[in-house]
Amino acid sequence: MRRTISQGLVWVAAIFCAAACVSAQVKFTDSTFAPKEGDFIAHDFKFSDGQTLSEIRLHYSTLGTPQRDPGGKVTNAVLILHGTNRAGRVWLAPSFAGVLFGPGQLLDASKYYLILPDQLGAGLGKSTKPSDGLRAKFPHYDYSDMVRASQILLAQGLQVNHLHLLVGASMGCMEGFMWGESNPDDMDAMLLLSCLPVEVASRNRMVRKIMVDDIRHDPGWNNGNYSEQPYGLRAALGHLLVVGSVPTRWQKEYPTAAAADKYVNDYIDQNMKTTDANDFMYQYDASRNYDASKGLDKIRARVLLINPQEDFWNPAELGIAEEQIKKVRNGKFVLLSFPESYGHYTFFQAAAWQKYFAEFLKTLE
């Protein structure tokens, strides 16, 4: 890796967790996985829009200990990139960490050095973001800025010069494709969950625009200088709820009007307590110029892409993933169908896809 390498929504995982997931978990308490946390300050960070911040804070959590070969190369680092507007600690959810991080499990924290960063700009994280003070004057970052910030964290903050595995979900999945193209020697393999490597367009882009406009066109937003969260954020969260829906499961879980109404109210009320409108807008707009489809042949790492059915963001019926993965020389695609699928957020449910992950890891031995 070159020198230029360069309580949140844990509850969401619980919402989608089924009893089938429990049997695969370690006995889980709040202290089962107690990560080390830290901050790295990167100086004079120039954004893709031309603006520069004199310093940015990059927060991270780690589990395990890095191991190096005789040449000093880190051999056991696993970077796990979260989705839009979340934080690294979402991966400590029982349905993920309890299935993967325990003794003898696929990402055993005593074997691997697990790195869970809070990505630049993410509202639920502790890394630098608009709500820290700059609000709408914050640089208009994109995914390339976020990837570069994570690369700087690894190289300069954690002295990690190689990744055995990059795991990315949703936004982190898209960033994985970008990273594998721009720095193909940085990692041995990538597990990418719930995304496509093509331009964010069609329905996916439409929903992002609608959510951003929900806030931007609310007079209460006041060009980002609000004293309380604008009502438009509630509307945006409502749209986010719908696009994260899982029709097959939700018909069983919320079969009455009363149950559906309660879920909507609880979801929005809880998220209004933890979400900032500017952070939300910036994160969902950061995908505006994403398109990894033209460089997939540059990826050298082994790649396993797992997408679920009933994913509003990435419609399986379009067949895009099947076609695009052919461009990756060592790529494989798995489509999870019901009952394995939990919609877009299936990535939180490691028990639903760990058998495919286990097969993939064997190819790295």
PLM segments and residue spans:
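Conserved acidic catalytic loop of the alpha/beta-hydrolase fold
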Residues: 144-164
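Conserved hydrolase catalytic core segment
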Residues: 162-201
